[in-house]
Design a protein with these regions (language model features):
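A contiguous, basic/glycine-rich beta-loop/short-helix subdomain that forms a polymer-engagement track
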Residues: 250-261
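Active-site metal-binding loops of divalent metal-dependent hydrolases
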Residues: 33-34, 59, 114, 133, ...
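Active-site neighborhood of phospho(di)ester-bond hydrolases with catalytic His/Asp-centered motifs
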Residues: 30-31, 51-60, 79-82, 109-112, ...
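Divalent-metal (often Zn2+) His-rich catalytic cores of metallo-beta-lactamase-fold enzymes
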Residues: 127-128, 133, 143, 155, ...
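Active-site metal-binding motif and surrounding structural segment of the metallo-beta-lactamase
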Residues: 37-79
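Divalent metal-coordination and catalytic microenvironments
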Residues: 22, 32, 58, 70, ...
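Rhodanese-like catalytic fold shared by cysteine-dependent sulfurtransferases
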Residues: 147, 204-236, 245, 250, ...
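Conserved beta-strand hairpin/beta-sheet module of binuclear metal-dependent hydrolase folds
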Residues: 2-50, 120-137
Length: 458
């Protein structure tokens, strides 16, 4: 049995989510577990520790919390805030303390991102009675703070004020030395400008985090003007995480489908090609949606429903287990199978192949003023406000399906984003909806800037 304190960080790629396994003297706690919970069980075996506590920092909106799944496997109780009417687990409140070996965890209520947000303050009593770690959930990140728009505009000012108070009255006074372990890293939808860092400190954030430099009035004003999109699947996650998600017990089995069986399912299934943009453009099965693999953990929630079976097309099917994990983390248990042999099998079988044109930024620059083109910027509005290609029209990729009437069917459609990945999603949506001439600008804004071409602002 290990005597010293153990802290393991479990990262969920794509979601940029971080959960934590902490333990001491044969006992362990898990904070904000993901749904595929084998990592925590494996760590408990590795360190010879029994998981005795499971904590949730808030009701997450971007992924399915794995607390019930983990509790089912290890028998540990679940704890979350009293300030939301959860239909499972046990409630905690400000000042509650829990002993895990020599570790003491104290609950600090830190509302703002959500009303029920809590942070967990850690002391290693074998070393000192002073706290030196705080798990901040979605309250404080490296270089950023949590978003405050989850409940809508009516209470946005109120939530921004609560977040400011949580930061300045609860967290910052703990001291510059305290290590901060947040629930997300760079790339998460839960904060706009999160810096990639394994951890940070309160002192470092005081010096470098722009959101901690603002007065309360400036902070609230910034939050009121912050523009971030809310994916439709968030509502599903909130229901699952409040009421309890269905138990999986194991990863879904994805059935390998031969060409004949695959073709039988095309009309009744959601077929997703998870290859990168250039590969998809070079050849794909007609009618399929392209979401690159790492993008599944967010954009599947915009593009796929939770009822119809999902079938996956990959390059060589080396990542099927990983793809299944990505999808179940946001509640897609309706995964049915995959094309055995990948797209290569389809191509080698003499089946029809659909293509999407690819343009370089130089191609677009050369034809930028061509009136036969309809150029679409599919980035978020906040990105567009920082600069866009002159003559382009803005339709966010997640909204494109509902705004196809705005896209003329008698013009050549050119799509761009920041790198070409989201543009490939958009191009596949357009193709499946009957648009014949569609091009994806590979490299998109990043390449446009690198080439020295100008952007405009409103």
């Amino acid at each position: 049995m290990v005597d010293m304190m153990i802290l393991e960080i479990i990262k969920s790629e794509g979601l940029a989510h971080k959960s934590y396994f902490i333990g001491s003297k044969g006992e362990a706690a898990v904070i904000d577990p993901r749904r595929d919970c084998d990592s925590y069980v494996n760590y408990s075996k590795k360190h010879e520790m029994q998981i005795t506590h499971i904590f949730e920092t808030h009701c997450n909106e971007d992924y399915v919390i794995g607390s019930m799944e983990l509790s089912k496997r290890v028998g540990a109780p679940i704890y979350h805030s009293k300030n939301l009417d959860f239909n499972y687990g046990n409630i905690v409140e400000e000042g509650n303390k829990f002993q895990i070996g020599d570790i003491e965890l104290e609950i600090i209520e830190t509302p703002g991102h959500t009303r029920e947000s809590i942070s967990l303050l850690l002391k290693d009593k074998a070393v000192s009675d002073d706290a030196y770690i705080i798990f901040t959930g979605d309250t404080l990140f490296a270089g950023e703070v949590g978003r405050t728009d989850i409940y809508g505009d009516d209470v946005r000012e109120e939530m921004a004020g609560k977040l400011y108070d949580s930061l300045h009255k609860k967290i910052i006074p703990l001291g510059d030395h305290v290590l901060v372990f947040p629930a997300h890293g760079s790339g998460s939808v839960c904060g706009k400008d999160i810096r990639e860092s394994e951890f940070t400190t309160i002192g470092y954030e005081k010096k470098t985090n722009p959101m901690l430099q603002k007065s309360k009035e400036e902070f609230i004003e910034h939050k009121l003007n912050e523009k971030m999109v809310k994916a439709p699947y968030f509502k599903k996650m909130e229901v699952y995480n409040k009421d309890g998600a269905p138990l999986l017990c194991r990863l879904p089995y994805l059935k390998p489908l031969g060409i004949t069986e695959f073709k039988e399912h095309i009309g009744t299934s959601q077929v997703v090609d998870v290859r990168m943009a250039a590969s998809f453009a070079g050849g794909h099965v007609s009618g399929t949606l392209n979401i690159w693999k790492r993008g599944l953990t967010y954009f599947a929630g915009w593009m796929l429903n939770y009822e119809d079976p999902i079938i996956v097309i990959d390059e060589n099917n080396q990542s099927i287990d990983e793809i299944a994990r990505y999808l179940i983390r946001i509640g897609y248990d309706n995964i049915y199978g995959y094309l055995a042999g990948g797209f290569t099998l389809w191509a080698n079988s003499g089946e029809k192949i659909e293509k999407i044109d690819t343009w370089s930024v130089h191609d677009l620059k050369e034809r930028q003023s061509d009136e036969s083109l309809f150029i679409i910027d599919v980035r978020e509005i906040g990105e567009r406000e920082e600069g866009y290609i002159e003559g382009s029209h803005h339709i966010y990729v997640g909204d494109l399906k509902d705004h196809l009437k705005e896209v003329p069917d008698d013009k050549y459609i050119v799509v761009y984003c920041d790198t070409g990945n989201r543009a490939s999603i958009a191009a596949s949506v357009l193709k499946t909806n009957g648009y014949k001439e569609v091009a994806n600008v590979l490299g998109s804004i990043r390449a446009w800037k690198a080439a020295g071409y100008p952007l405009v602002k409103d």
